[in-house]
């Protein structure tokens, strides 16, 4: 949108969001929009509208009303491996992502009951029926959700709401000013795109990381 003023870009962004049925509480033209990619996390006190697209990946949102502090990550695998620890990319993995993002809340002296936690994602996109004997072995989304629940519970964090699993991916929009999250289930084309992006990211992780 080069060539447009900041006000014009904000207005066009607002119209684009409105066309997708975004609730008025989230379609605030004054909020800068940030897209969260696989393996990324954000902790901020700025008012932002953060979007991300999930297939088998999961996101957890954290929000403190008292401090107006918000956090979110987009993790693709349940548990960080030893070979990946030195790479300084904790938000690729559910367990280390929770440690990294929630750690910023702990450093500010927040107690678990002061933090609103919501869980999203973990879809199963391989096309196997629930009773298929191999499903539990390749259900990365299910294992992501299970790990998130276990790690959050171990930290005394209650999940206030969640929308997880199923066979369709999700688009999220997280308002860091209010803690609200808007969720839209993906259509088949978007589902396939999200699946391909996650498969490419997992293949990259399987090769390890460079410490150059």
From Swiss-Prot:
One example GO MF annotation: protein-glutamine glutaminase activity
GO process terms (BP): chemotaxis
Keywords from the UniProt entry: Chemotaxis, Hydrolase
Pfam families tied to this protein: CheD (PF03975)
Record EC number: 3.5.1.44
Source organism, top-level taxon: Bacteria
Catalyzed reaction equations: L-glutaminyl-[protein] + H2O = L-glutamyl-[protein] + NH4(+)
Keyword Hydrolase: yes
Role description: Probably deamidates glutamine residues to glutamate on methyl-accepting chemotaxis receptors (MCPs), playing an important role in chemotaxis.
Entry similarity comment: Belongs to the CheD family.
Name by which UniProt lists this protein: Probable chemoreceptor glutamine deamidase CheD
Organism: Oleidesulfovibrio alaskensis (strain ATCC BAA-1058 / DSM 17464 / G20)
């Amino acid at each position: 949108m080069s060539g447009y003023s900041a006000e014009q870009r904000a207005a066009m962004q607002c119209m684009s969001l409105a066309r997708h049925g975004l609730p008025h509480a989230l379609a605030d033209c004054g909020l800068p929009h940030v897209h969260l990619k696989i393996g990324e996390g954000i902790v901020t006190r700025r008012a932002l509208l953060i979007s991300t697209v999930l297939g088998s990946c999961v996101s957890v949102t954290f929000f403190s009303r008292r401090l107006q502090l918000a956090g979110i990550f987009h993790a693709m695998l349940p548990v960080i491996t030893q070979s990946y620890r030195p790479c300084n990319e904790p938000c690729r993995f559910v367990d280390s992502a929770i440690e990294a993002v929630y750690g910023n809340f702990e450093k500010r002296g927040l107690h678990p009951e002061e933090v609103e936690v919501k869980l999203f994602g973990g879809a199963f996109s391989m096309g196997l029926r629930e009773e298929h004997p191999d499903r539990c072995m390749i259900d990365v989304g299910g294992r992501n959700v299970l790990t998130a629940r276990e790690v959050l519970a171990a930290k005394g964090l209650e999940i206030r709401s969640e929308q997880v699993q199923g066979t369709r991916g999700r688009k999220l929009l997280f308002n860091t000013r209010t803690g609200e999250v808007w969720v839209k289930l993906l259509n088949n084309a978007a589902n396939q795109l999200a699946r391909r992006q996650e498969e490419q990211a997992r293949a990259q992780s399987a090769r390890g990381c460079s410490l150059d």
